[in-house]
Amino acid sequence: MEREMAHDERLHVHCGMGLGRTTIFIVMHDILRNAAMLSFDDIIERQRKFNPGRSLDNNKDVSDKGRSEFRNERSEFLPLFYEYAKQNPKGQPLLWSEWLDHNA
């Protein structure tokens, strides 16, 4: 999707389960567009300001086991995805799956 979007196009994302999937999708979009110019920490901090909920804050308590596991997976996935995006702006030339095959 990112490859086909014009720079000024907007993306609207919504999920109603409260697990943080919308936030993660938006962070991934931000990473794909800005990894070449911003650090991972800068992108995450900006997204925390936009969405001050639990999704990106590992210091907030999560009592639901499913949410806790999802948070742990997220904290491992996002830095890896950032490295992919830094090497492949806008998801090019390698797809995520191709990059993983070379970097796993």
UniProtKB/Swiss-Prot annotation:
Keyword Zinc-finger found: no
Family matches, as PROSITE patterns: TYR_PHOSPHATASE_1, TYR_PHOSPHATASE_2
ATP-binding keyword on record: no
Region annotation (Disordered) ranges: 51-70
Annotated keywords: Hydrolase, Virulence
Residue ranges with Basic and acidic residues bias: 57-70
Alphabetized GO MF terms: hydrolase activity
Alphabetized InterPro entries for the sequence: Prot-tyrosine_phosphatase-like (IPR029021), Tyr_Pase_AS (IPR016130), Tyr_Pase_dom (IPR000387)
Miscellaneous note of the record: This is one of the putative proteins coded by the open reading frames within the region required for AvrBs1 activity.
Family, as annotated: Belongs to the protein-tyrosine phosphatase family.
Protein name: Uncharacterized protein AvrBs1.1
Organism of provenance: Xanthomonas campestris pv. campestris (strain ATCC 33913 / DSM 3586 / NCPPB 528 / LMG 568 / P 25)
